[in-house]
């Protein structure tokens, strides 16, 4: 409830959860490129962050994870508020590098995001791209930028179609 404090509607609660996730966690591109997706346990990630603990994927409370972990954290917090939320996976276009004509891996399942049911419909939420916080496992460098955008919080169907391919809900 602390994370969603001041939010009165489910939609506002989801927005606060999105902001919390984007502000407080770091994307681990090395884990992604080496397919080390073991950092997805949302309960450990949240607990370690809130208590400043170190673990396999956290140092002094700074937690690094991949898209699967970002989405799992968002999903766990949304469900804790009683808001139906589900995992979705598929492929996210490597923008701005590629477009659908130049993308090599369209059929590769390599990205996770979420959908939450609010106001009578499922909304698209990709908490990974709400931040550019980065962790470089090779160098140990942490780059903090905080929340950088709301582009993929309740994104329109048209917007999603330009960047994501659904492979499973």
Say what each PLM segment does:
Residues 1-61, 159-167:
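Secondary-structure boundary elements
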Residues 10-17, 21, 63-81:
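Active-site nucleophilic cysteine motif
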Residues 69-160, 164-167:
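Hydrophobic/aromatic-rich core segments of domains that either
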């Amino acid at each position: 409830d602390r994370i969603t404090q001041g939010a009165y509607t489910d939609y506002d609660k989801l927005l606060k959860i999105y902001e919390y996730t984007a502000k407080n966690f770091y994307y681990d591109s090395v884990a992604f490129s080496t397919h080390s997706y073991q950092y997805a346990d949302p309960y450990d990630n949240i607990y370690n962050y809130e208590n400043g603990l170190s673990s396999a994927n956290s140092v002094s409370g700074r937690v690094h994870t991949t898209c699967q972990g970002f989405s799992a954290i968002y999903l766990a917090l949304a469900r804790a508020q009683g808001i139906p939320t589900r995992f979705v996976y598929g492929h996210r276009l490597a923008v701005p590098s590629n477009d659908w004509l130049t993308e090599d891996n369209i059929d590769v399942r390599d990205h996770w995001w979420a959908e939450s049911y609010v106001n009578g419909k499922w909304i698209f939420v990709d908490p990974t791209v709400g931040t550019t916080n980065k962790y470089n496992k090779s160098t140990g460098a942490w780059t903090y930028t905080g929340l950088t955008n709301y582009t993929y919080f309740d994104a329109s169907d048209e917007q999603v179609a330009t960047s994501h391919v659904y492979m499973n809900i």
